[in-house]
């Protein structure tokens, strides 16, 4: 079972085809965008796994990878995704635009399209896809857009969704918006779900959403993992 599979091993490093989920994401960005610096944030339990991955990766690909151990070991003590982002920004004094993503999602299209979209719009951006199942809508972030892809509403796990566009954990943040994380946390922004900051930010400043041109596979359990492996082995 994937719980057992990932109890002592991080999901982003599970193999899909000939390489890990994280390799698929990182290699795509290096090959198709001008992104050349990566930061992996991990809990203490898995930090060494990512350090080992980094050592092997840097033997074959010449780009900068930093692994940050957030020092937490349990669900009860974890910082939450938004505070993890804040930790990285403060620790590394980051003052650039950021692409933030969860490492356990596989895409069948290039993220370069999303990066180009964000540059063109010159706002912080999210990705979205149609989700027509109510139960799934209630477990994710749901947005509505106008005809220029501007976000008009953004709700985390809504009981009564206003639309059917779901937001997966991929975000392009402008540097000026990244500076507002502390302000967000002080003003009611949730810190656990990765999309909480984007939801808060969308009410403060214009944000756009890129409608995904392909599929995203979330590795949630053993069935979804086996399915993704079968898709990528074709």
Predicted regions and their residues:
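Conserved N-terminal catalytic core of the sugar/cofactor nucleotidyltransferase
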Residues: 1, 15, 19-100
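Short alpha-helical oligomerization interface
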Residues: 7-12
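Catalytic-core segments of class I nucleotidyltransferases/pyrophosphorylases
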Residues: 115-119, 150-218, 222-234
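Short acidic-glycine loop/turn motifs at beta-strand connectors
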Residues: 144-150
């Amino acid at each position: 079972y994937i719980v057992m599979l990932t109890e002592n091993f991080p999901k982003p490093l599970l193999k899909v085809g000939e390489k890990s989920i994280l390799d698929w994401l990182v290699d795509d960005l290096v090959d198709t965008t001008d992104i050349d610096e990566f930061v992996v944030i991990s809990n203490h339990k898995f930090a060494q796994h990512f350090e080992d991955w980094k050592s092997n990766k840097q033997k074959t690909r010449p780009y900068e990878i930093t692994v940050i151990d957030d020092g937490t070991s349990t669900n009860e003590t974890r910082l939450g995704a938004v505070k993890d982002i804040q930790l990285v920004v403060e620790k590394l004094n980051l003052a650039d635009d950021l692409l933030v993503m969860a490492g356990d999602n596989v895409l069948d299209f290039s993220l370069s399209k999303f990066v180009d979209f964000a540059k063109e719009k010159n706002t912080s951006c999210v990705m979205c896809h149609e989700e027509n199942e109510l139960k799934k809508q209630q477990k994710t972030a749901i947005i509505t857009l106008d005809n220029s892809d501007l976000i008009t509403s953004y709700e985390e796990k809504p009981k009564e969704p206003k639309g059917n566009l779901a937001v997966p954990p991929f975000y392009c943040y402008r540097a000026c918006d990244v500076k507002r994380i502390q302000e967000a946390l002080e003003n009611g922004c949730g810190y656990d779900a990765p999309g909480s900051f984007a939801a808060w930010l969308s009410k403060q400043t214009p944000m756009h959403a890129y409608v995904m041109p392909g599929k995203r596979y979330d590795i949630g359990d053993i069935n979804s993992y086996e399915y993704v492996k079968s898709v990528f082995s074709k």
